Amino acid sequence: MKIVAVQIDLGRQKEKIEFIKSFVDNAEKWGYNTIILYLECSIRTKVTPFFDEDDTYSMTEIKEIADYIEGKGLLAIPAFENFYHIEKLLQYKEAASLSEFKDERIEGRGWSPERFKRGSVGCTSNPDFNKFFDAYITEVCSVFHGKYVHMGLDEVFEFAECPRCKARLKAGETKKDIFFSQVMHDYELAKSMGKTMLMWDDFFEYYDILAELPRDII
């Protein structure tokens, strides 16, 4: 099947389910056969019960959305971020240890507003980081029956600045190695769920890892 996809952003702001369904109806009418749901960290799961209900969806709600899309014969693809673009997660004290920064405005490049002072990048050198995201992504994906999952991995401009990551650099790894390692971790996670991994390609311009990646990443 040739994928003709449109994406709706549910990660940066919460939309009403009625609006999402109308968006899906219009997408189908306009000839799209695939809906990419950009979720980031916007679903309340077993590992994220602390998420603000006013700003996130329950598993029941995301299942209703996925079921509606798939019930129309369309493909629903969940899209995540588990490296950068996770500032909404890191604002919670329960997830503070997953960040590279305690205060990005002091320790990083100073891009972050007060609300997101821990920044947008997680520490992939912290073993709890991928443990958390593996559980989160796996639970959310359980309500999607298509073969694809989008792992994001874009715009990782500010990483490997914390003590854990700097220790890896001092030991001989490069930032390219750290990025490649996270891509491959996500690839194995997708495989474990029986899904094909999608990702954004912008950071191949900075870290030339394309030739080293499995050919079935899209």
Model-derived features: where do they sit?
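Aromatic-lined carbohydrate-binding surfaces of glycoside hydrolases
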Residues: 5-218
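N-terminal amphipathic alpha-helix/helix-capping segment at the start of soluble metabolic enzymes
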Residues: 1-2
